[in-house]
């Protein structure tokens, strides 16, 4: 009888039921990344979705239905760009923008404004092994120096948990 919001990993088979475009957005090639833990897969095909459900009641407060919706976070830059704008306000240091934001699905960058050596969003790159161990394995926030794609940064990472409390990713 209450509204529920959660972040969940959605299998490709479920994304396909909603539309080919969602499954295509979720599919990411994994890019070899310096200092990342070994990973045998060369791609990710499941998606991370922010989902919500709210009861619909009649005049007698009886639940007669549910409003349900979700937003696929893979390749969706609205959240990371908005957070960057709010927190870092376009500040620069030595001509370079400071502050970056990433949503990780497990250890994989699925939404980010971190850029690679070509100046493109570093989608498909991975987190460093030491951050992986702290945040994804031990479930602890990380605050400190970390290697991000191709540079050292002062960073903060927080686990993203699904509705059951399982760690499914990170916010950087």
Model feature map: region roles:
Residues 1-42, 74-90, 111-150, 161:
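Extracytoplasmic/periplasmic sensor domains and loops in membrane signaling proteins
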Residues 6, 47, 70, 99, ...:
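Glycine-centered flexibility motif
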Residues 8-10, 93-96, 100-108:
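Short hydrophobic alpha-helical segments used for membrane anchoring or interfacial signaling
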Residues 43-45, 63, 95, 149:
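Solvent-exposed loop and beta-edge segments used for protein-protein assembly and interaction
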Residues 44-62, 69, 100-115, 136-142:
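A short, hydrophobic secondary-structure junction motif
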Residues 47-84, 152-172:
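Conserved beta-strands of PAS-like sensory domains
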């Amino acid at each position: 009888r209450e509204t529920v919001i959660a972040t969940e990993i959605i299998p490709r088979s479920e994304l396909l039921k909603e539309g080919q475009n969602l499954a295509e957005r979720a599919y990411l090639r994994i890019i070899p990344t310096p200092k990342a833990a070994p990973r045998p897969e060369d791609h990710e095909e499941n998606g991370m979705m922010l989902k919500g459900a709210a009861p619909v009641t009649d005049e007698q407060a009886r639940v007669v239905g549910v409003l349900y919706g979700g937003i696929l976070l893979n390749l969706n830059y609205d959240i990371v760009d908005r957070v960057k704008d709010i927190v870092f306000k376009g500040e620069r240091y030595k001509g370079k923008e400071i502050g970056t934001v990433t949503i990780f699905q497990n250890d994989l960058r699925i939404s980010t404004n971190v850029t690679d050596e070509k100046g493109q969003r570093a989608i498909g790159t991975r987190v460093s092994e030491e951050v992986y161990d702290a945040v994804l394995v031990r479930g602890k926030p990380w605050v400190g120096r970390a290697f991000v794609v191709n540079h050292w940064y002062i960073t903060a990472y927080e686990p993203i948990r699904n509705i059951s409390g399982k760690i499914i990713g990170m916010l950087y």
